[in-house]
């Protein structure tokens, strides 16, 4: 099937590997403590704090614990390969197709990144998480204000646990950069900031441009569109 083929490289099927980034045990261990429960695991937080990587690290943890890679399916609406999943019906159809093609046995682990970009996503997530005839465990991420706790409790009928993901802490920053804990490294952390992708940039100008672009994205996608603000200059 062409849809399965198009998303294959983003999944662990057929011996594929995925980039898991820097280990963040503070979060992965928290998520892991709920493994085995059918409550929906929801990772929230602002854009680019590393939610996707924590999803992947959780999936790799499952594989290391003996779960078959065929029982794990990734869906990421930020990638064009998943453009065919526009609404809850598309999502439901894809999961059925995945089951027919991969034929997983036992519990199925579904990871959906940027779930808010799928219209009506909560209908499928609620249905699968409450289906006592099938064994699903669901993990989702969301970045914008549609994923605020107040709305989550309505969308998911209270059957979820939320993990709020933050940028790198000073301890994580020092560990990743292999820097000694102290005043000098702390000042560097304060200057650089904690966004994980900044680790790959050396130039201060590049870092500033990255943060400026991120700020504009948050304003446009999470504030202006959300609240239909007409006079953008007021921001």
Predicted regions and their residues:
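Walker A/P-loop
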Residues: 52
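Short regulatory helix/loop adjacent to the ATP-binding pocket of P-loop NTPases
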Residues: 146-161, 177-178
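Conserved catalytic/switch belt of AAA+ P-loop NTPases
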Residues: 122-140, 146, 153-154
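Hydrophobic anchor at the beta1->P-loop junction of P-loop NTPases
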Residues: 43
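Walker A (P-loop) phosphate-binding loop of P-loop NTPases
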Residues: 47-48
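Interdomain hinge/linker elements that couple catalytic modules in large macromolecular machines
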Residues: 1-15, 20, 167-235
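Pre-Walker A adenine-sensing motif
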Residues: 18-35
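Short glycine-rich substrate-engagement loop in P-loop NTPases that contacts/grips substrate
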Residues: 73-106
């Amino acid at each position: 099937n062409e849809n399965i083929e198009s998303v294959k490289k983003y999944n662990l099927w057929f011996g594929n590997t995925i980039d898991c980034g820097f280990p963040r045990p503070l979060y992965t261990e928290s998520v892991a403590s709920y493994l085995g429960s059918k409550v929906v695991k929801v990772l929230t937080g602002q854009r680019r704090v590393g939610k996707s990587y924590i999803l992947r690290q959780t999936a790799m943890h499952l594989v290391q614990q003996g779960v078959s890679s065929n029982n794990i399916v990734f869906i990421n609406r930020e990638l064009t390969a998943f453009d065919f999943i526009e609404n809850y019906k598309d999502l439901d159809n894809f999961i059925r197709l995945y089951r027919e093609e991969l034929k997983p046995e036992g519990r199925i682990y579904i990871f959906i990144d940027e779930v808010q970009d799928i219209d009506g996503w909560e209908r499928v997530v609620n249905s699968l998480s409450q289906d006592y005839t099938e064994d699903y465990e669901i993990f989702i991420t969301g970045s914008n204000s549609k994923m605020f706790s107040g709305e989550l409790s309505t969308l998911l009928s209270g059957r979820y646990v939320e993990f709020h993901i933050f940028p790198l802490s000073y301890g994580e920053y020092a560990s990743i950069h292999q820097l000694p804990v102290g005043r000098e490294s702390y000042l560097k952390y304060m200057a650089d900031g904690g966004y994980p992708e900044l680790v790959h940039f050396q130039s201060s100008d590049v870092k500033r441009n990255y943060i400026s672009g991120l700020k504009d994205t948050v304003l446009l996608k999470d504030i202006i569109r959300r609240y239909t603000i007409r006079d953008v200059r007021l921001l």
